[in-house]
Amino acid sequence: MSAVVKSIKAREILDSRGNPTVEADVVLSDGSFGRAAVPSGASTGSHEAVELRDGDKSRYNGLGVHKAVANVNTTIASAISGFKASDQQRLDNLLIELDGTPNKAKLGANAMLATSLAVAHAAAASRHMPLYRYLNNSEEYILPVPMFNILNGGKHASNSTDFQEFMVMPVGAKSFAQALQMGTEVYHSLKKVLKGMNQNTTVGDEGGFAPSLPTNKDAVEVILKAIEKAGYRPGEDIFIALDPASSELYQDGKYTLATENKTLSSAEMVDYWCGWVEKYPIISIEDGLFEDDWDGWKLLTRKIGNKVQLVGDDFYVTNIKRLDRGIKEKASNSILIKLNQIGTLSETIAAIKMANNAGWTAVVSHRSGETEDTTIADLAVAMNAGQIKTGAPCRSERTAKYNRLLRIEEELGGKAKYPGKDAFLNLK
């Protein structure tokens, strides 16, 4: 007999930025236990599901989550009591119905996601399986190529570049463990290079360095130097990935690059990226344009979509309606997957499957406000996503995910494949 939900208890905990977030514990009728904690973003897409905050300025500057916690402990708890834990789709559909809004504004995506994931963890425990195997009981699994965010700017760091994230991807590694080693060595090499330039080596929200560099190009140049100093070849062993978070640069129909004193039109921004791709070993650009600049996205995809992964984050917000339009209009070739943008596990998996069915890649991602929860590591492996974005190899809320992937790779042995360049399905 399948185990059913016996109890659920949510609480307010802290994320890595010291802001409150929701954690939920689920106990099943057979005694199995599952726990999940929800992350939170700094630069958020306007189309994301609603993260319910209290707005009470006397607590945590209005960022408390007592309302979301209460929604789990009352409305959700009574609705899912006795519910078959292994029926994830039905459970998530029930949560969506209970909420009844298009953007999860009533219960809160944070309340719903904590519930959805905690039940999945409990159901996996009930079957004595790790979460990745419970979600996809397969003979072989693909471990993800990591995107290490080693240099931060934009909203993730003050006094730095216009663009939010400069990342390295160890595409030439033979295993996840080797990829982690390569990325970490480049990270430490970058620290030495920055110190040699008398630059600040304090770290941003995601563990990357946040130096004061005169231009955006300097960020790429300094990373290339760090790759070489670590003994690796840029464009062969290690590639560069970018997340400029361009929606943060967009105002009144133009893109403002403050460090370069430039204001660019959509077409000029596309040409800007084309120029960078010609010059540097860039394999992936996320949110290269504003989240509603559909014409710009289509132009960028036409120009460089056959040689660079173009990832929609704020553009798609893990939402299958927006993704479906993107696929039909050829507006990119990849989607960033963030569980809390949509608010349930089933909807997240549906977005990954939709992308893969279109021949697109799906990059499983953390948020800048994280916890020690490692669900995304299991999700990336379960869905054979091939890529994961979870910060620098620094700060334990980031390394928790990398360490989980090391353990999964070890557990799987010969059944684990590290895809390298094959993770980029759509590049010529």
Curated annotation (Swiss-Prot):
Keywords: Cytoplasm, Glycolysis, Lyase, Magnesium, Metal-binding, Secreted. It is found in: Cytoplasm; Secreted; Cell surface. Its cofactor is Mg(2+). It comes from the Bacteria. Mg(2+) binds at D243, E286, D313. Binds a second Mg(2+) ion via substrate during catalysis. Pfam families: Enolase_C, Enolase_N. GO terms for biological process: glycolytic process. Its EC number is 4.2.1.11. It catalyses: (2R)-2-phosphoglycerate = phosphoenolpyruvate + H2O. CDD domains: enolase (cd03313). The active site is at E206 (proton donor), K338 (proton acceptor). Pathway: Carbohydrate degradation; glycolysis; pyruvate from D-glyceraldehyde 3-phosphate: step 4/5. Catalyzes the reversible conversion of 2-phosphoglycerate (2-PG) into phosphoenolpyruvate (PEP). It is essential for the degradation of carbohydrates via glycolysis. NCBIfam families: eno (TIGR01060). Belongs to the enolase family. This is Enolase. The lineage of its organism: Bacteria, Bacillati, Chloroflexota, Dehalococcoidia, Dehalococcoidales. The gene is eno.
